[in-house]
Amino acid sequence: MRVPEVKQTHFTLIKLVKQTGFTLIELMVTVAIVALLASIAFPMAEVAAQRSKEQELRYSLRQIREAIDSYKQAWDEGRIQKTLGESGYPPELKDLVGGVKDAKSPEEKYIYFLRSLPRDPMSIDEQATAEETWGKRSYESPPDDPQEGDDVFDVYSLSEREGLNGIPYREW
């Protein structure tokens, strides 16, 4: 038995082609859904990036503050040469990295408190050195109005922005 041939006309071919493609409305709905998803994801990515920088800031502040405390402890123990009128805190941040002579070491070894000084992750000045990215408070300076002086008692961010918790970075 023979199957009859179906005669394909121009009209049936056009109908088949139209059924295989996307309509303009389907395309517009797809673009709208993708745009909606992107508008939700973009702010979340910005918050995640800011949160990452804030974690880096917390870590850097803790690292520098622990090094300053270690310097003060070494000074209190007499391992750093004492001079009349000094507070016992490092004169500059670079002293934490460059090291100081151990006064109790017969070989005059150096004591190092940091391997490298971290940059303030909130600093926008790419040309500044790591030390220049931090605000420095001296021992003689009041806590509510930090000023530089003869030593470095504490560090803070110079950024004017606020953290996700609503507290300005310079108050961390």
Protein language model regions, located:
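Low-complexity, acidic interaction segments enriched in glycine
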Residues: D69-W172
